[in-house]
Design a protein with these regions (language model features):
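Periplasmic plug
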Residues: 1-19
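Short, flexible, glycine/charge-rich loop motifs used to bind or transfer phosphoryl groups or to couple energy/partner
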Residues: 2-5, 23-24, 36-38, 222, ...
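Outer-membrane beta-barrel translocator/receptor signature
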Residues: 8-11, 22-99, 107-111, 164
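Transmembrane beta-barrel domains of outer membrane proteins
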Residues: 16, 61-67, 79, 102-106, ...
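Membrane-spanning beta-strand positions in outer-membrane beta-barrel proteins
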Residues: 45-47, 73-75, 110-116, 171-173, ...
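Composition- and surface-driven signal marking solvent-exposed, interaction-prone regions
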Residues: 61, 92-93, 183-185, 196-198, ...
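Acidic/polar loop-and-plug regions of large Gram-negative outer-membrane beta-barrel proteins
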Residues: 83-87, 100-106, 110-173, 188-219
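Face-selective signature of the C-terminal outer-membrane beta-barrel domain
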Residues: 166-189, 212-240
Length: 240
């Protein structure tokens, strides 16, 4: 049930190198990737896109943002993605629907509250199978195996993942010295997964061993990040 956010819903991806556990909790020592979602903008922007490709690939995107009122105290943003395509292997498909609305309230120049919503459904996903080396990169007396060879079981395999999230971001500057930042997020991921996959060829080079994997998962994540910032000066030294 690992979360996976469609890249179109992201503003940017930051690479944080080295240990970051002091700031962000348990994480690999080599660093981590910070995915930053799209936020409402004070400048109006409207984008609609459609793309077509091989394997009956069709993907539609939409991104709308701007102020709601004339004073710019209320801002909004709405991003959406829809995807349908055939997978690399025969009988497999990919499908996705994702929505990301957000709303910002700025009552004054020193206060800002942003609310985020996120929903993504992947009712189908490409097979995680593969092809054996004999017949692809190594010789096989029975010939080559097609690159779209499907090693699964159509009546059994399935993948269905749903993700939803609600988050907030509050900033308040009291004066030139003190400010606070309050952030919180709830994320739920549900995934149902059944798979049959290749597990090597028998010595006769024509019988395929297969394995089975099945999973029913649900995960809830709660994250809080509260910060107080003060800027002080002691003689020639500035402190934050």
């Amino acid at each position: 049930a690992s979360p996976q956010i469609d890249p179109f819903l992201l503003e940017r991806v930051e690479v944080l190198k080295g240990p970051t556990s002091v700031l962000y909790g348990q994480s690999p020592a080599g660093g981590l990737l910070n995915q930053v979602g799209k936020r409402p903008t004070a400048t109006p922007r409207n984008e609609v896109g459609v793309e077509f490709g091989t394997n009956d690939h069709v993907r539609g995107t939409a991104d709308f943002s701007g102020p709601i009122d004339a004073e710019g105290k209320f801002l909004y943003r709405f991003s959406a993605v829809g995807l349908s395509e055939d997978g690399q292997f025969r009988t497999t498909e990919n499908e996705r629907v994702a929505l990301a609305p957000s709303f910002t309230w700025r009552p004054d120049a020193d206060t800002s509250l942003t609310l985020f919503g996120f929903y993504q459904r992947d009712p189908r996903s490409n097979s995680y199978g593969g092809v054996p080396p004999e017949g692809t990169v190594l010789p096989n007396p029975f010939g080559r195996i097609p690159v779209d060879f499907y090693d699964g079981e159509p009546g059994f395999e399935q993948f269905d993942r749903t993700q939803k999230s609600v988050a907030y971001d509050f900033d308040k500057r009291f004066d030139d010295t003190w400010s606070v930042r309050l952030n919180g997020r709830w994320l739920r991921t549900e995934a149902d997964y059944d798979s049959v996959y290749a597990n090597g060829l028998a010595p006769d080079f024509r019988t395929l061993f297969r394995g089975v994997a099945t999973s029913r998962e649900a995960m809830d994540s709660y994250t809080l990040d509260n910060q107080v910032e003060g800027r002080l000066t002691t003689g020639p030294v500035n402190h934050t």
